[in-house]
Amino acid sequence: MSVRVAIAGVSGRMGRALLEAVAADDGCALYAALDRPGSSLVGQDAGAAWGAANGVTVTDQAQAALKGAQVLVDFTRPEATFGYLEACALDGVPVVIGTTGFDEAGRARIAAAAERVPVVFAPNMSVGVNLLMKLAEVAAEVLQDGYDIEIIEAHHRHKVDAPSGTALGLGQAVARASGRDLEACAVYGREGVTGERDPRTIGFATVRGGDIVGDHTLLFAGVGERVELTHKASSRATFAQGALRAAKWVQGRAPGLYDMRDVLGLK
C-alpha cells in the first residue's frame, strides 16, 4: 500500500526533486501538491511544469488539500513551514521537515507541534550526511581537545541562509560529543587581526556560488596531522530519497520530535 504524500513548495528546486522521487518510488503516491499563494503553479498540474503531468493540481489551500494525506513533506521557508505545521496538527498528519534557517524560537514552535503529531525534523535528509553526523560524533569523542575543529560548507548562489543547517547540525554533533556549548564556542567567519585561535572554539566557513548542491567538510586539525570528513552531494535526488524514507518510517509513530538518526537507526 503506497503512502499518500503531500509535498509543500512544489515550485522550488527540492519540490521538483520530490515530485520526481515520488513518481519513481513504488512505496509512495502523490496525494497533494502545495505552493505559496500567488505562485504561478497554483491551478496547474503539479508535474506539467517539468514535462511529467501527474493528475494532481497544485493548490495554496493547505487545510483542504491535507485531508486524507498520510504525511506532508516540507521544503519551503520557516514562515511557510509554521502554517503547514498547524494545518497538519489539526488533521493529525505526520510531517517531514527539511526546511532550514529556523531560529531558537522557530525550533521551539516545531517541538510544540510535535507534541500533537509525529515530526521528523532534519537539516539534511541525505543518508550519507547523517552517517557523517555519526562519524563526526565518534571523531570528536576520540580526538578530544588536541585537535582544532573547523566546518566548511559550500552551496549554490541562491541559498538564503548561512551557515547551512547541515553545518550547524555538524557543529551541534561535535559540540555534544566534546562537552561544549555550540552557542558559546561557535565562530562564524574571521576577519582582520583575530589573535590566536581559542582551542575550544568551533569555526564555520561559508562558500556560496554557482550551482553547488551541497559540500560539507569537518576538519580536525592537530599537530602533525589532520582528519577530514567530507560529504559532497551531486544531486538533490539524494535529499528527496531520504525525505521519502522518513515519510514511510514516520507512519504509525507516536507524536514526538524525531530526526534522521531515528529514521536510520543511528542513535
Swiss-Prot record:
Could you tell me which cysteines form disulfide bridges?
Answer: none
Job of this protein: Catalyzes the conversion of 4-hydroxy-tetrahydrodipicolinate (HTPA) to tetrahydrodipicolinate.
Q: Name one GO biological process term.
A: diaminopimelate biosynthetic process
Which pathway is this protein engaged in? Amino-acid biosynthesis; L-lysine biosynthesis via DAP pathway; (S)-tetrahydrodipicolinate from L-aspartate: step 4/4
Name of the featured protein: 4-hydroxy-tetrahydrodipicolinate reductase
Q: What are the record's GO terms for cellular component? A: cytosol
Q: Report the EC code(s) recorded for this entry.
A: 1.17.1.8
Its annotated compartments are:
Cytoplasm
Q: For NAD(+), which residues are the binding ones?
A: 9-14, 35, 98-100, 122-125
Q: Which residues bind NADP(+)?
A: 36
Catalysed reaction(s)?
Answer: (S)-2,3,4,5-tetrahydrodipicolinate + NAD(+) + H2O = (2S,4S)-4-hydroxy-2,3,4,5-tetrahydrodipicolinate + NADH + H(+); (S)-2,3,4,5-tetrahydrodipicolinate + NADP(+) + H2O = (2S,4S)-4-hydroxy-2,3,4,5-tetrahydrodipicolinate + NADPH + H(+)
Query: Its Gene Ontology molecular function terms?
Result: 4-hydroxy-tetrahydrodipicolinate reductase; NAD binding; NADP binding; oxidoreductase activity, acting on CH or CH2 groups, NAD or NADP as acceptor
InterPro entries assigned:
DapB_C, DapB_N, DapB_N_CS, DHDPR_bac, NAD(P)-bd_dom_sf
Please name the catalytic residues of this protein.
155 (proton donor/acceptor), 159 (proton donor)
Q: Which CDD domains is this protein grouped with?
A: DHDPR_N (cd02274)
The record lists (S)-2,3,4,5-tetrahydrodipicolinate as bound by 156, 165-166
In terms of PANTHER family, this protein maps to: 4-HYDROXY-TETRAHYDRODIPICOLINATE REDUCTASE 1, CHLOROPLASTIC-RELATED (PTHR20836:SF0), DIHYDRODIPICOLINATE REDUCTASE (PTHR20836)
Family, similarity comment: Belongs to the DapB family.
Classify the main location.
cytoplasm
Please provide the record's keywords in A-Z order.
Amino-acid biosynthesis, Cytoplasm, Diaminopimelate biosynthesis, Lysine biosynthesis, NAD, NADP, Oxidoreductase
